[in-house]
Amino acid sequence: YYGKEIDTMGNRLYESTVIPNRGAWIELETDASEVVAVRIDRNRKLPATVLVRALGWDTNESILDLFWNGQTDEDGLPVYDERIVRTLEKDTTQSADEALVEIYKKLRPGEPPTVESARNLFDNLFFDARRYDLARVGRYKLNKKLGWRQRMLGQTLAQPIVDTETGEIILDAGVQVGEEQLDIVAKSGVFSGEGFAEFYITNSDGVVSKIICNNCNLEFNHRTVTREDMIANISYLLNLM
């Protein structure tokens, strides 16, 4: 579920909620400063970068690079997403272990945390099929909403789609993607592996955005959420803003 509202000052606020058939909710929301926050299992909110860090991007640099749209300034330095920069300014954690402990303290207030107990709680919360179940319909909806076909359709590519193994250009930059182009990409197999599908688009204002998609090749019986789902969900929200 994705939603948008206008606050009393006229700011656009965005939200996203992943509600499994069984297990912890993941809620994203933005504020007037365009800081992105996450609520896990309907608890108090955290900067969304805490979740990203807990998933394995444990340095500020790796998080900035993850969402970087590839653009540079006149000196050739990366121009990072200001929304991620502002969110990192609210994030007091500096490593994956610290992020896991911070999440643990929100979910289990009053209980003394250790890195091991925090990691076990996090893994059990999302990646244990006995505790988390999207159901087949939930996996279908995530694959459709966050998969590369849905995200690419109707967009104008800012960079070419390239087969990294052969160097072959599958689609050129500047192409507006329709069903025919989607079929060309699908036939090429460039997004048929594990992990993310990533590409870059140019919107109607000429702004370049990086699109991060989940692994939509997962079968419908894969009912736990994945780290690719979580990152793709944040990417989707950023591209609504």
Where are the regions a protein language model picked out?
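N-terminal non-catalytic structural scaffold regions of very large proteins
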Residues: 1-241
